[in-house]
């Protein structure tokens, strides 16, 4: 079966970064792999950033996605948390860029609307729809589920643009 696109979805975090790779095979979404890069809070922040970068680089090398999709930073009440998240997001973007992967960015609202049709969907609703769309019974973590959701959002967006004759 010919697959048209393999996408790496990334849900960045300074303690846990989710990742998920899916393929679009003849308009059927297929789960390739997913998981979470879990880091110790007692490890220094620069070491955690290096670990995120190295693990994502290894995943990219092992699974050869054609592009990456990452969630944008959402509005955060805690400025420090938003800054830490932005650093983690930056090293994830660097891993994709160093692998020469086209990178697509989506807001949490866009991801939720793409999967559930409602921009204020709960994490549980996102996980249930992700499992349904990928025809899998279990996802290792909510972070992996969120990363898979970002990848699905990108494939839905790419399909729509293709059907409309708009370059992705």
Predicted stretch roles:
Residues 1-168:
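Phosphate- and other anionic-substrate recognition elements at nucleic-acid/protein interfaces
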């Amino acid at each position: 079966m010919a697959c048209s696109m393999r996408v790496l979805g990334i849900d960045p975090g300074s303690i846990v970064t989710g990742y998920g790779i899916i393929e679009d095979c003849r308009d059927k979404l297929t789960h390739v792999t997913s998981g979470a890069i879990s880091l110790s809070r007692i490890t220094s922040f620069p070491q955690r950033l290096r670990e995120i970068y190295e693990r994502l680089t290894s995943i990219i090398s092992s699974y050869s996605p054609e592009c990456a999709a990452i969630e944008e930073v959402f509005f955060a009440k805690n400025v420090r948390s938003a800054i830490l998240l932005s650093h983690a997001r930056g090293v994830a973007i660097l891993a994709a860029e160093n692998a020469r992967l086209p990178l697509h960015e989506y807001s949490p609202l866009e991801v939720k609307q793409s999967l559930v049709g409602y921009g204020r969907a709960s994490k549980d609703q996102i996980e249930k729809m992700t499992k349904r769309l990928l025809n899998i019974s279990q996802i290792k973590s909510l972070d992996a589920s969120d990363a898979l959701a970002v990848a699905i959002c990108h494939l839905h967006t790419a399909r729509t643009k293709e059907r409309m004759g708009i370059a992705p």
